[in-house]
């Protein structure tokens, strides 16, 4: 409490901290509506907190006192770990050099008390791991969440930039992930996750699977817990739209998911596949990977970076239930080889016509004004009225 009282209190609801001790005490004593502002500088990681709970319209906010000079939380097993929290917002921090995870938010292993109403905004997370299943942002048993304008770079070679296990009703928007083409995955939602949108994100060489819809989860980690006699899936009702994916062994992986929509995205030079359809969880009761919808996407590739016609289909899947429509496929070096090997016929697909990208070598994958592909890809995505 001494450190807590030594923190500069501007009012009942704003606390400015400048040391790791002040930060820890302020969070431990946080009440609904408090805003904890970190001065510029470096803070020691390895911070764990439980039951930090704001209230509706009265969240607890942890942020930078000066967003132009974001404080750095460095090191520890995890820079920050929160369990069983609610109405919590974390903004404008830099999280670096943790051994296992940059930011971990979970339900404390008690599946009937999920963390909920979480906002993560303007975070920079980098250099996590570097070996093993280590994540930039790890969410387990989290509901009603937003991850906005975050940048995640270099996570564990067996981990994810953003990993969601048993998470529901969330949106990941305007985030940027950067790594290498063949290390870990980018964004993943598995373990029973549902009703999650991934919107306007940019993934640059973000692992061997840039976006994984579903995955492979130990049965004991599903949230809600699996019940006998019901149909099971790694994930349901996931949507990816307006995203740009550069590189990666596989751009989009449907893995044991029952219902996912991928639309108005731009994929540029995947190293083997634009799409993977896989089933890795094969225990009794699990439905085959099915009901994927892939429409209005722009896929630009090279023939020497293209395997199996750009689509990899594994056993125990139901590729015949997928829908493909209005996608624009272009092979840079051999336009006549632009047609992909899809499991079912595509409706109104376009093959072999140059989309006229603006400046792909410099990372600008928008299209020129005269482009014939103006109506597909990430540049063509417009938020539906329901989201405004």
Positions of predicted regions on the chain:
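Right-handed parallel beta-helix/beta-spiral solenoid domain characteristic of secreted/periplasmic
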Residues: 14-18, 37-40, 45-46, 53-102, ...
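Bacterial N-terminal signal peptides
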Residues: 1-3
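Glycine-rich beta-solenoid repeat tracts in large extracellular/virion proteins
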Residues: 28, 46-51, 77-84, 101-113, ...
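Acidic Gly/Asp/Thr-rich repetitive segments characteristic of extracellular carbohydrate-active
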Residues: 12-49, 371-375
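Acidic, glycine- and Ser/Thr-rich low-complexity intrinsically disordered tracts
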Residues: 287-291, 295, 301-388
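Right-handed parallel beta-helix
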Residues: 40, 59, 66-68, 86-97, ...
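Short, polar loop/linker segments at the starts of domains and inter-domain junctions
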Residues: 25-29, 74-81, 364-376
